[in-house]
Amino acid sequence: MYVCLCQGVTDNQIRDAIYEGCCSYREVREATGVGTQCGKCACLAKQVVRETLNDLQSAQPVPAFGTTAFVAA
């Protein structure tokens, strides 16, 4: 869906910017142009950023202790 009509930015483009390394709304704004014209989309854009970052964080695997084998040289 379109989040920013002024710049033609979709929620998928915002998510893609995060998947490509953006870690904040500010970085997404700089990468996509979302929220740089009238600003009415900023709240929704921030929500998409927040939800996507939370989804990524919860999807990160947590390493279990004792599962890594070290080989002595």
Curated annotation (Swiss-Prot):
Note on cofactor: A phosphate ion (or another anion) stabilizes the protein fold and the [2Fe-2S] cluster.
Keyword Transport on entry: yes
Gene3D superfamilies for the chain: BFD-like [2Fe-2S]-binding domain
Pfam families, alphabetized: Fer2_BFD
Keyword Electron transport: yes
Residues engaged in binding [2Fe-2S] cluster: 4, 6, 38, 41
Cofactor(s) listed in the protein's UniProt record: [2Fe-2S] cluster; phosphate
GO molecular-function terms, A-Z: 2 iron, 2 sulfur cluster binding; metal ion binding
Stated consequence of mutating residue 2 to A: Does not bind [2Fe-2S] cluster
Binding positions for phosphate per the UniProt entry: 26, 29, 46
UniProt keyword list: 2Fe-2S, Electron transport, Iron, Iron-sulfur, Metal-binding, Transport
InterPro entries linked: BFD-associated_ferredoxin, BFD-like_2Fe2S-bd_dom, BFD-like_2Fe2S-bd_dom_sf
Task of the protein: Required for mobilization of iron from the bacterioferritin (BFR) complex, composed of BfrB and FtnA in varying proportions; mobilization requires the [2Fe-2S] cluster of this protein. Reduction of the BfrB heme group occurs in the presence of Bfd, strongly suggesting that the BfrB-Bfd complex allows heme to mediate electron transfer from FPR to the Fe(3+) iron core in the BFR prior to its release as Fe(2+).
Domain notes: The C-terminal 17 residues are not required for [2Fe-2S] cluster assembly, interaction with the BfrB bacterioferritin complex (BFR) or iron mobilization from the BfrB core.
Family: Belongs to the Bfd family.
Name of the featured protein: Bacterioferritin-associated ferredoxin
Organism the protein comes from: Pseudomonas aeruginosa (strain ATCC 15692 / DSM 22644 / CIP 104116 / JCM 14847 / LMG 12228 / 1C / PRS 101 / PAO1)
